Amino acid sequence: WCVEPDTGQYYYHKFARQQVDLNWQNPQVEQEIFRVIDFWKARGVDGFRFDVINFLTTDGIGPDNPIDNGEQRHEFDINQPGIIDTLLRLCRYVRQQGNAFLIAEIGSDELDILARYQSPELMDVVFNFNIGSQKTFDISRLCSEINATQLQQSGLPTLFFSSHDMPRMISRFGEGPHDIERAKAVLALQLTVRGVPFVFQGEELGMID
């Protein structure tokens, strides 16, 4: 919780204090989000990425999350009751304005939870960090995670290895003379396995941090 200095009122944020949580129990919030979608659709945007969308507050604040090793374990503020119904309305509204590709980042490493948010009526694809955030070059583990994803998800999986939230792929996977070979191997995997590839700007050049 933070206090807003001009009003003296408190506001809630799950992440950075600049990222104020919205109260999705309030119908006016939902309507305002629809107006934001209208703004961008009118300018030709044909897709949206919804960040940590399973953290929407649709069932109130609830009790405090438990603490593990000094960090909160998100338990009561994630995958709340009502969130799927809220997202169904959101996705339905977006598609009523014309075709759009909907991408969700889900704050979970459990494939069954990821699968809840992906369907023809919900998100087209969901990010799977089990694949994308691996810290070392381990082909057998990469293939194992990809196979598990292919079996679990009914829709298309996502394939990415870098993002703004993590070090670049080659900075994690490379080892001097092996940098180029490993970059080629991972990109070949990314572009040939069934799924939707996401290439982070600079990856096509083998860029490092």
Regions found by a protein language model. Give the residues of each.
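Active-site and adjacent substrate-binding regions of carbohydrate-active enzymes
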Residues: W1-D209
